[in-house]
């Protein structure tokens, strides 16, 4: 953690990477790249592309906005969720599974919302900020919802893989209908995290 803290200080001091909208207080988990940061990022991407192109991957660039139907078919609408809990007093939100792991040192991955809620109540886990009681655990979908046009429901893609899957047939026939072949994509994906990272790592 000390090394990460030192790297962060250097990045801030030299304007390599810094919080978005910093002069207005910023927003947790969002960062801008200065010139050096952008060059480092571009070099990493160039090396990744070089590696995959040498392995004969086909590169695509898909839309970052996809219709609701894509995520209904993939299961993201129902299962791309985190269990969250709200403090009754200070109104802070927390990842319920993280609270349990920190307090009880047990993993709850795969457990239902009801099971996670029961564990919190039985072990009297309180708000880490003010030590008050917590509300019931609920599901929080990690995708950013959009309206395209007047009423078309869509989402920012939470992973770059969606475009590869939905474009597979088009790419397959466009490149001679021969197997095997591989597709790659470098781009942005979007997740509405309850506890965003404090830095890039």
Where do the model's predicted regions map?
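TRNA-recognition modules of translation machinery and tRNA-sensing kinases, especially anticodon-binding
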Residues: 2-201
């Amino acid at each position: 953690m000390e090394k990460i803290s030192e790297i962060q200080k250097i990045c801030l001091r030299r304007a390599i990477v810094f919080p978005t909208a910093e002069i207005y207080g910023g927003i947790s988990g969002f960062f801008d790249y200065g010139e050096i940061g952008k060059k480092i990022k571009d070099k990493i991407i160039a090396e990744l592309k070089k590696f995959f192109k040498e392995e004969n991957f086909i590169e695509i660039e898909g839309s970052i906005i996809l219709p609701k139907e894509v995520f209904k078919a993939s299961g993201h609408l129902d299962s791309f969720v985190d269990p969250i809990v709200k403090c009754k007093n200070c109104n802070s939100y927390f990842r319920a599974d993280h609270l349990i792991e920190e307090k009880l040192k047990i993993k709850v991955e795969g457990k239902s919302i009801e099971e996670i809620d029961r564990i919190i109540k039985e072990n009297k886990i309180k708000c880490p900020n003010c030590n008050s009681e917590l509300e019931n655990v609920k599901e929080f979908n990690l995708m950013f919802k959009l309206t395209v046009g007047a009423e078309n429901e869509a989402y920012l893609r939470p992973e770059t893989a969606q475009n590869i899957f939905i474009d597979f047939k088009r790419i397959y026939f466009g490149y001679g209908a021969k197997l095997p072949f591989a597709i790659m994509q470098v781009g942005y994906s979007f997740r509405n995290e309850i506890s965003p990272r404090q830095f890039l790592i």
